[in-house]
Amino acid sequence: MSILWRNDNGTLISCVEKIKVMDQNMAELKSVIQDIIDDGVLMGVAEQQIKEEILKLLATMTSQY
């Protein structure tokens, strides 16, 4: 399932290349997050805490543009 990407005004992004880049970035992010969760669980860290820390980190991030 592909995400319907929107701009700040809520208009759908229609550029195929932009959508492709965003979808690829999300796939890469999912893979990295899965690695973090798997590594943490294998080392005995609570899965819920890992997810909470990832969300905290995300909440601190803003666009550099």
Predicted regions and their residues:
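Short, charge-rich amphipathic interface segments used for partner binding and complex assembly
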Residues: 32-64
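N-terminal acidic leader/helix
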Residues: 1-34, 60-64
